[in-house]
Amino acid sequence: MELLRTVSDTKRTFYALHTRPINTIYRRVVEELMVEMHLLSVNVDFSYNPIYALGVVTTFDRFMEGYQPERDKESIFSAICQAVEQEPQRYRQDAERLQAVAQSLPVNDLVAWLSQANHLQQDADLQAQLQAIANNSNFKYSRLFAIGLFTLLEQSNPDLVKDEKQRTEALKSIAAGLHLSDDKFSKDLELYRSNLDKMTQALAVMADMLTADRKKREQRQQQASTPVAPPNE
């Protein structure tokens, strides 16, 4: 019998693949995403789908905004995926494909499609997966899947997701069509949006602190380089 990989195994693999240090404010983001993906990957009811992939990519890209050095971001993402024995290119490609579909559709058509009220021809593979999800009583729902659905709405019509009434109605329709818990779905997305706001605020505070620190250093350097006039005799 094959032993299931543990969270420790996954973390060990990640840090073997990405050996550069990770900035403190982002380390928690990276580890929480990695642990969430790990726990799903070892769940017997979980199966990969493009909407989940979009949720993973969106979560990483949004919460890693502003990360320095910028060139390390793709290495970190790649290491996360490989640590849970997944292909990072597959996640990126599926995410890009779904975003392109969402951007090409009026939001009402997208909601009807996601809620299985209508069948559209833009992506036969996604259509088949949506039907399979709706018909699978053991479908393993996840927060990352919810974020993927939310991202599709956001890509189709950014104004809709900012309007509480329209957003709530769209999410209820999608949850009903895919047989998801509306309460769980809504709460997960509220938490996601709240955490994004907190991360934005934390980054703004950090940027202000770095600016203030730089100004202090510049002042000290200026004072050190200013010649002191000799005292008058």
UniProtKB/Swiss-Prot annotation:
Region (Disordered): 212-233
Keywords: Coiled coil
Coiled coil residues, start to end: 183-204
CC per GO annotation: plasma membrane-derived thylakoid photosystem II
Keyword rRNA processing recorded: no
Domain of life: Bacteria
InterPro entries: Thf1
Record GO biological process: photosystem II assembly
Summary of the function given for this chain in its UniProt record: May be involved in photosynthetic membrane biogenesis.
HAMAP family for this protein: Thf1
Family under the similarity heading: Belongs to the THF1 family.
Protein name according to UniProt: Protein Thf1
Source organism per UniProt: Nostoc sp. (strain PCC 7120 / SAG 25.82 / UTEX 2576)
Record lineage: Bacteria, Bacillati, Cyanobacteriota, Cyanophyceae, Nostocales
Name of encoding gene: thf1
